[in-house]
Amino acid sequence: MTTQPRKILVTCALPYANGAIHLGHMLEHIQADIWVRFQRMRGNKIHFVCADDAHGTPIMLNADKLGITPEELIAKAKADHIRDFAGFNISFDNYHSTHSEENKQLTAEIYNKLKANGFIKSKVISQLFDPEKNMFLPDRFVKGTCPKCKAEDQYGDNCEVCASTYSPMDLINPRSAVSGTTPIVKESEHFFFDLPAFEGMLKEWTRSGSLQSEIANKMQEWFESGLQQWDISRDAPYFGFEIPGAKDKFFYVWLDAPIGYMASFKNLCEREGIDFNEFWAEGSDAELYHFIGKDIVYFHSLFWPAMLEGSGYRKPTNVFAHGYVTVDGAKMSKSRGTFIQASTYLNHIDPECLRYYYAAKLNDRIEDLDFNLEDFVQRVNTDIVNKLVNLASRNAGFIAKRFEGKLSDKLEDEALFAEFTAQAEQIAAYYESREYNKAIREIMALTDKANKYIDEKAPWVIAKEEGKEAELQAVCSMGIELFRVLMSYLKPVLPKLAERAEAFLQAELRWDNIHQPLLGHTLAPFKALFSRLEKKQIDAVVEETKALFAAANKAAEKTEAKPTALSAVKPIAETITIDDLAKLDMRVAKVLKCEAVPESNKLLRFELDLGDHTRQVFSGIKAAYNKPEELEGRFVIMVANLAPRQMKFGVSEGMILSAGTGGSDLFLLSADNGVTAGMQVK
């Protein structure tokens, strides 16, 4: 019985139109592209769309800083993004923008349906307002002192030191991140999406069994803490879509951004005559998958399905989340040259190298992927050049010189060929479940077997013996046949290498003809299929990245008219007395254990030795220390008489001291040699 092709729509998260594509973005787009290319090889009806996320305050402010319109800024970003994705052979059927007529119409339609169905509420809220810039300030554009732990220079929605969340109104000494002025409080009517009304549906969706276990578990935590109404409006000035019937009110960027998936697909539908409703209507039998990063799971697993449900559209079949990219075990860094832009990479290295390396490490779990530069060079050269391509080159020469490019009319080892083709469904299952690392492992194991076969048959020896022409042709043809099977399996990962292999083989690499050998087939002249990756290419990428970072810093210094309250060195705090200082009991503590708190993006948990007892302390320095275990054994300075604080993850019994501006720019304070745990700082 013939199986009907599946109808599938795939999206990637929308890159923000306020910056360049980097290798972190490329993890997701390569992951999705491999899956899409595999589905095409299997004969399924699949569409692959994306778009730029083109709205929001940061775009408005950056355009103003550059002296251009927001429309000009996002147009350039879109052109750059399309160029970079094409450079990595990402096979989108359409790449659009959320600042489009399709998105404007769909956003208004969905909002009006939600409103008509009673899911939009309004209430007057108090907000911080920048009187100099004449604008309300989003949470991330306010900074001040944390109301809980008193840490300075914290954002308006959460503290990076103690991980507390709060309202910008609660900040101590708030200031505008736009102008540096002290904001005032103003009231404004805002519109809210009634997310709690969808709790039952969301719980049922979570229990469907299709979501990744990490997402399902995280959603359960959110249910337990209680769903809240979601503010979907922003006040003018704002770059985005105006809310119908609400003067000077705009949709929050995260309201219209996911609708951008629908808008990009609608744009494709109108251009190619595809039925939009076949994929988006309630009750659709098409499959809908979103590939996203773990940082935006909240929006895609709660708000987005609820919005769709409330407006009469179908929900996603699944949401596939992945982790972050680290480089050599650390967070991507501009100063170290590891915050690598896609365009910088493409200036020096074949994109297929990165596609292969990511595939060799990607699985179906939400895990960070380490891009180890030394391992990158070794793996590409070992697997692709030394094993895979060499299999073709070491046999093609004999076929060309001795047999005019014609393959044998029989298989030299039918059992071995059957063993290779028998793995087709297992490898397909690995691709289907996004366990690319297992697929690559299986393919490379077969590649080793193919090379072992050639080593044992030794065609270079057979070629010197008289009367063994048929054997030589059969052995070398077998090597070419095995290469064809391997390249068929790798075609979703290495599309350009597959194209060159197809030109050499003079045959299309298809999943449905893997079992059909090219008996008596004539090959094209063999040309080099792939070049070795050299360390100097990696060095060039790193150096160019450093240079770009340095140039950007220099340009920023030139354009900065004057230091703001955010960029200047912080003034010395209010004078205190010696009696005030004496209240602080600061101690030297030895780190016995340090580990990341999985449920937090910012916290590390420390177990500290204070000489006569141990303590647990949580510290918001996760972004600065990617390998917390390396802190074990170090001496740190802590405030020992700070009242214990109950946090979500346990009790924090003190505060560890660090210096810096926050985020990844934090540095633990330590003591000189000779100190012991428990010593008092005087």
Swiss-Prot record:
State the Gene Ontology BP annotations.
methionyl-tRNA aminoacylation
Location(s), subcellular: Cytoplasm
Q: Which Enzyme Commission number(s) are listed? A: 6.1.1.10
* Alphabetized UniProt keyword annotations: Aminoacyl-tRNA synthetase, ATP-binding, Cytoplasm, Ligase, Metal-binding, Nucleotide-binding, Protein biosynthesis, RNA-binding, tRNA-binding, Zinc
Identify the taxonomic lineage of the organism of origin: Bacteria, Pseudomonadati, Pseudomonadota, Gammaproteobacteria, Pasteurellales
HAMAP family reported for this sequence: Met_tRNA_synth_type1
Show the PROSITE patterns listed in the entry. AA_TRNA_LIGASE_I, TRBD
* Protein name (database record): Methionine--tRNA ligase
Gene3D superfamilies named among the record's database cross-references: HUPs (3.40.50.620), Isoleucyl-tRNA Synthetase, Domain 1 (1.10.730.10), Methionyl-tRNA synthetase, Zn-domain (2.20.28.20), Nucleic acid-binding proteins (2.40.50.140)
Ranges in a coiled coil: none
Signal sequence coordinates: none
The gene is: metG
Motif 'HIGH' region per UniProt: ranges: 15-25
Catalytic activity reads: tRNA(Met) + L-methionine + ATP = L-methionyl-tRNA(Met) + AMP + diphosphate
Essential cofactor(s): Zn(2+)
What is the role of the protein in this entry?
Is required not only for elongation of protein synthesis but also for the initiation of all mRNA translation through initiator tRNA(fMet) aminoacylation.
Short sequence motif named 'KMSKS' region, residue ranges: 331-335
EC main group = ligase
Domain tRNA-binding: start-end pairs: 580-682
The UniProt entry's sequence similarity note says: Belongs to the class-I aminoacyl-tRNA synthetase family. MetG type 1 subfamily.
At which positions is ATP bound? K334
Q: Give the multimer and partner information.
A: Homodimer.
Please tell me where Zn(2+) binds in this chain: C146, C149, C159, C162
